[in-house]
Regions:
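A short Gly-Trp-Pro
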Residues: 1-136
Length: 136
């Protein structure tokens, strides 16, 4: 049974999750902006054991400002970034919200790294606001 599913732009990479997201949040850090080409990135976090993917993915790993390995997984055909992993949070997958089929489940609870946000980006004042990364 799939709670939610998604794919890359060309449909070569598909995934499903058999659980609800643990948390959904927007990240405004410089690295997320540059990796996505957007003013911020929305991620749905799930346990890796609840994630099933079909299709070939390639990856790119870089160091975060905190010194963790950040690995981005993307479709080698269309280039869509589908999900990521942070070595500082083993067993957790960060699914890129733009790839999710069930758009109605995308309800972020917080904005991260507001100190780095693009000044013209509107911010939903109903969400928790974090200047950096929260400890939990």
């Amino acid at each position: 049974m799939s709670i939610f599913s998604g794919s890359c732009l060309c449909g070569s990479v598909n995934y499903k999750s058999n659980s609800d997201p643990l948390v959904i949040q927007n990240c405004h850090c410089d690295q997320c902006r540059k990796a996505t080409g957007s003013v911020y990135l929305t991620n749905l976090f799930i346990k890796e054991e609840n994630f099933e993917i079909t299709g070939e993915v390639h990856n790119y790993t870089h160091l975060s400002d905190a010194g963790n390995n950040m690995t981005k997984y993307f479709c080698p055909k269309c280039g869509s970034q589908v999900f990521g992993k942070n070595s500082g949070r083993p067993g957790i997958i960060a699914i890129r919200a733009g790839t999710v089929n069930e758009k109605d489940i995308i309800k972020p609870i917080r904005n991260l790294f507001l100190k780095s946000k693009v000044p013209s980006t509107p911010i939903n004042s109903n969400l928790e606001a974090c200047e950096g990364m929260p400890l939990n």
